[in-house]
Amino acid sequence: ISLAQWSFHRTFRSGETSPYDFAKMAHELGFEGLEYVSQLYPDVTKSSDKPLAIQNFVTKNNMLSAEYKMQNVLIMIDEEGDLSSSNEESRLTSIENHKLWIKAAHDMKCSSVRLNLYGEKDPEKWIENSIKSLATLSDYAAPLNINVIVENHGRITSNVPLLMQAINGSQKSNCGTLPDFGNFCLAEEGYGSIFNGAC
């Protein structure tokens, strides 16, 4: 059983606990696997040298997961640009940003990365852009033995038929979904959860 780091996002964001205490906390709670959240590491997100910061992230977490005999399972990638954007330059930049985390997941012996598909409201354009980005990232991830999985994360990404068109349209066996069963709200206002926001 693995633990999502997001379960303690308030604790880590408050600064009272380092995100690098995640392995220790999960171990003490009886979990065996770790699901990391990229946005919870300010030493990475605020770094002027992102590749080096991610490399340090990998080194530290590999040491900690080994120390506590934990398995690295997943990295949830946030705030690395819009993979579904119709601005081609922005979309391609986002792809390159995500590749850094896919390589990190490989170096940590994870099985998957989770990404978001934001950047376009028009359904047809969103599907087209999403398919291109998913196909590119899945091709990059395949030889690294990493699965590329998409979370329904509010707004258009929570439209299941459209999301599955994007997933299936990639035609990649290592591309799939990470369902969040509390996140099927399509509202543009608020986070998009059935528990708050406009839903």
Question: Where are the regions a protein language model picked out?
Answer:
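Glycine/proline-rich, positively charged
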Residues: 124-134
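Acidic/histidine-rich catalytic cores of soluble enzymes
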Residues: 23, 33-34, 132-199
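Short glycine-centered, acidic/aromatic-flanked micro-motifs in structured strand/loop junctions
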Residues: 5, 38, 117, 150-152, ...
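Short, small-residue-enriched loops and turns at beta-alpha junctions
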Residues: 42-44, 80-83, 120-123, 154-157, ...
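Surface-exposed cleft-lining segments at the edges of enzyme active sites
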Residues: 87-89, 120-125, 147-152
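Juxtamembrane/interface motifs at transmembrane-helix termini
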Residues: 112-113, 186
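N-terminal pre-domain/capping segments
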Residues: 1-108, 112, 125, 142, ...
